[in-house]
Structures are given as structure tokens and as C-alpha cells.
């Protein structure tokens, strides 16, 4: 389904891909600019307590909290489950089936991570470890992918198995991505059964293929449930 959804089976008439100018911060800022009420950013959430009248969202070290009618957990499935102080059996049973894998992302300018023939360079470039075929990495050519107006080539390599010149590394980030196995795919269809239970709703890329667009799509569907 993933390959079909992205048109990867097609040799001709493949879909045209587009990149949002200035990346994801553009649509995040666009959404924030349209919020008429107050919003708070960069709060570390300790726990979420729920009752019949609403929800308390605890943050910080002083056990402070915000009180709301409902809460939307638009985070990874495992993170959402960890925040809930009293998860239901269904929430635990369903959300525990979504696993995540740590990935290392390296931003650099080392052209040795790309194909030797520059004519073969593209936005996404995959490499397979010759000593371990189960070990692979992907290098994104950011100049091409994000239309960077600079002369130097900048790359983003995910889980490099090869050495990248340390003098050409600008940043290294560790983050997590959904890991889709049979259990995860089976439980995607069950996620709607835990929506709007105990004043709690869920959204995230794990509802789909793990992309930003999947997160947005799940949010739209979640809002339909919220307004029912």
C-alpha cells in the first residue's frame, strides 16, 4: 500500500512531488497565526489526569496544571500512552502495538555519501551496506529537495553506516519514526474505537504511513469525531 500510495510502482506518469517553502515550520506558523485564543509552546507534560468533567494536563516541576474540557494527544502512540495516568484497557491494548525506532540524522556537506556519478544524484539516494544487506541508509540532497539557493551541496543522511567527514558535519539529531509491522497495521483500524473516550482524542502520523501528511489527515478525521 505504501509503494502504491506514493506511485513507486509506476515507471511513467509518476506523481509530481512538492516541498513546502521553508519546510514544516511554515504550516505550523500558519496554523498558530489563525488561533484566536491562547496557546502555549514547549511545555514538558508530566501526566494527564481525566475525569467525567474534563482533563488536567500537568507540567513542570511544581505540579502545575492546565484544566480543559478535552485533550488531543497529537504525539507518538507510545508517548501518548505514557502521558495518560489512567489508560483504559483498550488504550493500552491498541497503542502498545505501535513501535518506534530511533534514527540518527546527520546534516553535512560530504559528497562521498552520494553516488559517484553526479548524473545519478536525486532527492532521495539509498545505500546498502555491502557487509550487511539488512543495514541501509538514505541520503537526501537538500539543495534539490528544498530548493536551497546556495552553492554548496548540503545533505541529510539517515542512519549512515559509512564514515562522514567530521569537518563537514553541521548537526546530528536523534529522533524516532514509526516502525510498521503486522500488529501496527492491524491496529490502525481500531484507533477510532478509542477516540473521544474519557475526554481524550488521538492524532498522529501512526494513523497512516508516518508522514506529516498522515498526521494532518488524522487530525482532520479526529475533528469530525470531536464535533459529533
Task: Annotate each language-model stretch with its function.
Residues 35-36, 68-69, 197:
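Short, well-ordered alpha-helix to beta-strand connector turns
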Residues 34, 86, 225:
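Active-site catalytic microenvironments for nucleophilic, acid-base chemistry
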Residues 39-41, 73, 202:
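A structural signal for the hydrophobic beta-strands that form the central parallel beta-sheet
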Residues 17-24, 64, 73, 208-215:
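Aromatic-acidic/polar surface patches that form glycan- and anion
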Residues 1-48:
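Active-site/ligand-binding neighborhood in enzyme catalytic cores
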Residues 46-178:
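Mid-domain catalytic core of redox enzymes
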Residues 164-228:
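C-terminal catalytic lobe of FAD-dependent flavoproteins
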